[in-house]
């Protein structure tokens, strides 16, 4: 949908700055669902992981990095059948940590302090969206 989004944006005279957000919001990350599905359905096949990656480029600013994180976290959160505080926290951490592992933010002027703050905000937002109550320890 990245390429079609760029085409649609250009057709509608959207500024290049906005198109850059469309272009970078998946970076060069792997489309895990299709990759895992392929491995499951064709276990004997030799697979080139590059065939299951978005073309990029990777985010180049804090803002494009935040969009990438938000898009991935939001999409992943829809897969949770019964969101809990723990599952939402784990989802935010694992999603963003995977992006860091894949070096999606190496061209951004973003710090680990920034990323930690962003994670906290996303966790709070998801708790609110899914109406999850804070789990207090039992006395």
Residue ranges with predicted function:
Residues 2-7, 13-139:
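Terminal helices and disordered tails flanking the catalytic cores of nucleotide-processing hydrolases
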